[in-house]
Amino acid sequence: MGYRVEADRDLCQGHAMCELEAPEYFRVPKRGQVEILDPEPPEEARGVIKHAVWACPTQALSIRETGE
């Protein structure tokens, strides 16, 4: 089963905690909002992605399971 990483742009305040936790999957430009570099990352990245989602202080990130 696959998964997709999603961001709620209304909640993101650009704290960049996700980028600190998983820089290969998230980027936050100065005074910007999160950019998800790979919205459907490999299964082996799930642990680091979950940690980055957990680290978001505004809970702007989420993981959605896909049927694939």
From Swiss-Prot:
Q: Does the keyword Transmembrane apply?
A: no
Highest taxon of the lineage: Bacteria
Keyword Lyase in the entry? The reply is no
Q: Which UniProt keywords apply?
A: 3Fe-4S, Electron transport, Iron, Iron-sulfur, Metal-binding, Transport
Q: Which GO terms describe its molecular function?
A: 3 iron, 4 sulfur cluster binding; metal ion binding
Q: Which Gene3D superfamilies match?
A: 3.30.70.20
Binding residue positions for [3Fe-4S] cluster: C12, Q13, A16, C18, C56
Give the cofactor note: Binds 1 [3Fe-4S] cluster per subunit.
Q: What cofactor does its activity depend on?
A: [3Fe-4S] cluster
* Other comments on record: There is a positive driving force (of about 95 mV) for electron transfer from NADPH through the redox chain (FprA and Fdx) to CYP51. Thus, the overall process is thermodynamically favorable.
What is known about what this protein does?
Ferredoxin that is the redox partner of cytochrome CYP51, a sterol 14alpha-demethylase encoded by an adjacent gene.
What protein name does the entry list? Ferredoxin Fdx
